[in-house]
């Protein structure tokens, strides 16, 4: 089986879409680092050994030429590893799980040019930078100490997980190189801006639990279907545009939107069907549900509840009345030009 054939059989164990949130959101997978927990300063050197490799290798497959076989899957989780230099010799690996160790350096992975799937969660990495890996589809670096998004340029990368790191700003994600990237997970970082996420192929973007105050730089994401902004500090709904024509699910729970008038800024999203605004000050207004439907007639669900036909009919009446009132307003009188003076 060639690497091209194997692309369809890679093992994406991360969800591409956000589940509905009836309760406080639970993290996908284990929390490798509890809130406030610090990493120990030093660990005893623990290199990856041949014995560990024998225990962790599985999935025997044909190599590229079809004449030989090699194990292509490796799992060496929770081994207190500080060094994976030995991986340089295992060039046929396609699936690698090195999570829950104490790794600070991923450079040996640069030799794994057949790699399709990588999970390096819960280590001590400060960067996700690696050489360009031509077949890598899924990469997860959750719960490390990563501070930037530089050096990620794998052309077939589809899903990138950087949840639970220390990233303040997104930089270096080049849309001309990341031509297949459709899902980016940046939940639980320290992001202060949404600038730098200029990835036109992006479909799912998770930015919950950051320090965002507004949405900016996402206006041209025409393929985006899911945008998750829960638990930030957003108080305005500016930054959305008609170009975001595929957006169906928008989660703004736990932000600071106080003015119901902000909802009007979402009416240019033609496919928006589900909006979550729980735990925002504006939800205390008695006309909250009605105002949302008046502004967004195609909305199907607000927070946990779907709209009933009676609510839709009432919103239609209000919308029609507002339209008629606007049509009856006198046009503002234009100032006369000097040469048009009546004197």
Swiss-Prot record:
UniProt keyword tRNA-binding present: no
User: What is this protein for, i.e. what is its function?
Assistant: Essential for sperm motility and male fertility. Plays an important role in the proper assembly of the third radial spoke (RS3) head and the bridge structure between RS2 and RS3 in the sperm flagella.
Q: What is this protein called?
A: Leucine-rich repeat-containing protein 23
| LRRCT domain location | 280-318
Task: List the gene name.
Answer: LRRC23
Q: Which GO terms describe its biological process?
A: flagellated sperm motility; radial spoke assembly
Q: PROSITE patterns from the xrefs?
A: LRR
Ranges of compositional bias, category Basic and acidic residues? 318-337
């Amino acid at each position: 089986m060639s690497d091209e054939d194997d692309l369809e059989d890679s093992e994406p164990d991360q969800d591409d879409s956000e589940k509905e949130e009836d309760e406080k959101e639970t993290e996908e997978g284990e929390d490798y680092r509890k809130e406030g927990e610090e990493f120990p300063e030093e660990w005893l050197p623990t290199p990856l050994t041949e014995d560990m490799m024998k225990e962790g290798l599985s999935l025997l497959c044909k190599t590229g030429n079809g004449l030989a076989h090699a194990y292509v899957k490796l799992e060496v989780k929770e081994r207190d590893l500080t060094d994976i230099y030995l991986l340089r010799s295992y060039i046929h690996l396609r699936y690698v799980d090195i999570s829950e160790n104490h790794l600070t350096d991923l450079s040996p992975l640069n030799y794994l040019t057949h790699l399709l799937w990588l999970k390096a969660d819960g280590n001590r990495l400060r960067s996700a930078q690696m050489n360009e890996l031509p077949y890598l589809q899924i990469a997860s670096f959750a719960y490390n100490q990563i501070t930037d998004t530089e050096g990620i340029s794998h052309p077939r990368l589809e899903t990138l997980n950087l949840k639970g790191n220390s990233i303040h700003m997104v930089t270096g994600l080049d849309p001309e190189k990341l031509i297949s990237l459709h899902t980016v997970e940046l939940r639980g970082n320290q992001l202060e801006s949404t600038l730098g996420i200029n990835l036109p192929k992006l479909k799912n973007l998770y930015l919950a639990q950051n320090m965002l105050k507004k949405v900016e730089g996402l206006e041209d994401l025409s393929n985006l279907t899911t945008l998750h902004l829960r638990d930030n500090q957003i108080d305005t709904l500016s930054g959305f545009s008609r170009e975001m024509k595929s957006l169906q699910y928008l989660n703004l729970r736990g932000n600071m939107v106080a003015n119901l008038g902000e909802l009007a800024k979402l009416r240019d999203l033609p496919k928006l069907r589900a909006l979550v605004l729980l735990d925002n000050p504006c939800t205390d207004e008695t006309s909250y549900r009605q105002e949302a439907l008046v502004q967004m007639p195609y909305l199907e669900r607000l927070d946990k509840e779907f709209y009933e036909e009676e609510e839709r009919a009432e919103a239609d009446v209000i919308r029609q009345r507002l339209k008629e009132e606007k049509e009856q307003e006198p046009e503002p009188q234009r100032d006369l030009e000097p040469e048009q003076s009546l004197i």
